[in-house]
């Protein structure tokens, strides 16, 4: 526009057409999952100092999508999306692929999310479970004990085949931050 003298001389034009090119090499799409494969590279691109102890991984899995976002513990830095997929059913295999793609074993962030996602990460059976509690060995079918018994034994291990544990846990129980209310990336739902 300046070359045709359509703008005044003091007008500055900025072009943002290629700002995404640095990020394209950091993210990879595989089996319908878009995932950041180089978290350190992403942080360098965004000019953020990455200390894994200062971040927590939030995983949300509504009906039609799966999202993974890094939140800063002090909420002074922006949220950083590290994974997204559409039309993938949440399953142990999908979560395992996601955790391997973002190199969770390298960073070992604390994890927060809804109880269904946390149960998947811990390898628990998804439906019709007898021992559905993550922390205690509470029998969900013993309704007569729910209101009379106050002390339930702590869950000793997450061994596959014992007390509704189907798969090997992908994260340590100590890395889980339990939600106080159901969370959503968009809005917080209050029941």
Show which residues each predicted segment covers.
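Short, basic/hydrophobic alpha-helical segments
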Residues: 41-44, 93-107
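Short hydrophobic beta-strand that contains or immediately precedes a catalytic carboxylate
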Residues: 58-59
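Charged (Asp/Glu and Lys/Arg) segments that form or flank catalytic channels of large polymer-
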Residues: 92, 104-191
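Short coil/turn segments at secondary-structure boundaries
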Residues: 12-13, 69-73, 81-83, 136, ...
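Electropositive nucleic-acid engagement tracts
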Residues: 1-50
């Amino acid at each position: 526009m300046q070359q045709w003298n359509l703008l005044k001389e003091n007008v500055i034009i900025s072009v943002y057409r290629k700002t995404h090119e640095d990020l394209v090499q950091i993210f990879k799409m595989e089996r319908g999952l878009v995932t950041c494969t180089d978290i350190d590279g992403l942080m360098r691109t965004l000019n953020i100092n990455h200390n894994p102890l200062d971040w927590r991984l939030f995983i949300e899995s509504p009906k039609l999508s799966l999202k993974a976002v890094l939140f800063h513990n002090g909420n002074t830095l922006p949220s950083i999306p590290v994974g997204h997929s559409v039309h993938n059913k949440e399953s142990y295999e999908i979560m395992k692929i996601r955790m391997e793609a973002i190199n969770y074993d390298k960073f070992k962030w604390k994890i927060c999310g809804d109880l269904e996602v946390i149960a998947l990460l811990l390898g628990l059976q998804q439906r019709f479970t007898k021992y559905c509690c993550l922390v205690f060995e509470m029998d969900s079918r013993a309704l007569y004990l729910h209101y009379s018994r106050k002390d339930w034994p702590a869950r000793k291990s997450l061994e596959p085949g014992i007390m509704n544990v189907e798969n090997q846990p992908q994260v340590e129980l100590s890395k889980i931050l339990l939600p106080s209310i159901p969370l959503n990336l968009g809005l917080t739902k209050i029941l």
